[in-house]
């Protein structure tokens, strides 16, 4: 990843020995220094992409806005406790079109070393059997960015 003049390569390899989740991690800095870590947990360990995919399986029918989902996440430089917050349901209009979806709204929260929480990504998945991610709002150090679904095929409905 790149952020300003910082350049990093983050890699994670997953395996599941003895019914545990093992995350072998490599973190390469711009100057070539490499940090490797190997962490194992009885709980599943996620990365940014896999936690969004996991959100597609959530049954939120009994959830109230504000529900917190705690999980372990690797960033290639270690495994940390992280949080998703269910924000409720919202109608999301797509960019430049007439299309709108009723969505589940979830926020990915990072907690710094002092315990202060910061919303990093808000993502929206359709509130139907498909649970398709249709929008991401990312809050970056240098501003913000949004990503929108532009098409999908093979959906169940």
Residue positions per predicted region:
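Hydrophobic, well-structured mid-protein blocks that either form specific transmembrane helices
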Residues: 16-58
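Acidic, serine/threonine-rich low-complexity disordered tracts
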Residues: 1-26, 60-157
